[in-house]
Amino acid sequence: MPELPEVEVISNFLLDKIKNKQISNVIVNNWNLRAPITKNIDDMLKGKVIRNIKRRGKYTIWNTDGSVAVIIHLGMSGKLIYADHDQMRNKHDHVVFLFSDNTSIIFNDPRRFGLVIVLNKEQETDFFSDFGIEPLTDEFSGDYLQELLKNKKVNIKSALMDNKSIVGVGNIYASESLFRARISPLRSAKNLTYRECEKLAAEIKNTLSDAIAAGGSTLKDYAQPSGSAGYFQNNFYVYGKVQKPCKICNNIITLIRQNGRSTYFCNACQN
């Protein structure tokens, strides 16, 4: 699943390519994703101009001049593809946004866990109302993290992946950030010291920023709208490295399951 860095890379690409473009048509080839695509999406968006593109958590948001926004989540396997109008369509191209300059954005999603909806400003505010803090903001700090975690009765990795507390830190970047901070994913969240919270907050920011600079992580499905792969996976310390030596100490990387998700860590470096 694309996480915060991948969606940030996608949103930045789209901001450069489709800001101030007018939507001429929206073609829906499959209405049934994880939730139905907004009815009358073509009528709602036809003639609208894209004024801004931003990210919230793992969602990319296209604000238009018509007080409505397109909200897209890529699910497990979704992609947004930048193409000309006449590019040959593929089997899983569920939604095609056509622009007046003969370019298009194609939403392709083989597993159909993605989301494409249109909301007005009030609906957009309500939709994101229970989302947690953005980890790349100045407000996200050691002080904030310690206050957030002090009553959490879960392990630290699960706490980091709670979207109502912190958005966008998915499985990959939780594992990598905890390694960089030298904190075991098995630790109780509420027992982290202030110094550990300070270190962890910094390493979450560093890990996410490094991943964005690398174009994200391409493991299976993710690609940038241009078709280019990300390469942050080449810099992983622990994720996907089960039974391989730790880059720091040569101890063998451990794989466990936490809340149904794979967790990778070095039990020598992380405590």
From Swiss-Prot:
Enzyme Commission code: 3.2.2.23, 4.2.99.18
Molecular function per GO: 8-oxo-7,8-dihydroguanine DNA N-glycosylase activity; class I DNA-(apurinic or apyrimidinic site) endonuclease activity; damaged DNA binding; zinc ion binding
Binding-site residues for DNA, renumbered to this chain: 92, 111, 152
Top-level division of the source organism's lineage: Bacteria
Pfam families cross-referenced by the UniProt entry: Fapy_DNA_glyco, H2TH, zf-FPG_IleRS
FPG-type zinc finger segments: 237-271
Record PROSITE patterns: FPG_CAT (PS51068), ZF_FPG_1 (PS01242), ZF_FPG_2 (PS51066)
The entry's keywords: DNA damage, DNA repair, DNA-binding, Glycosidase, Hydrolase, Lyase, Metal-binding, Multifunctional enzyme, Zinc, Zinc-finger
Cofactor binding summary note: Binds 1 zinc ion per subunit.
Cited CDD domains: EcFpg-like_N
Cofactor(s) demanded: Zn(2+)
GO BP terms, alphabetized: base-excision repair
Keyword check for Acetylation: no
TM helices/strands, residue ranges: none
NCBIfam families documented for this protein: fpg, PRK01103.1
Quaternary structure, from the entry: Monomer.
Family to which the UniProt record says this protein belongs: Belongs to the FPG family.
Protein name per Swiss-Prot or TrEMBL: Formamidopyrimidine-DNA glycosylase
Gene: mutM
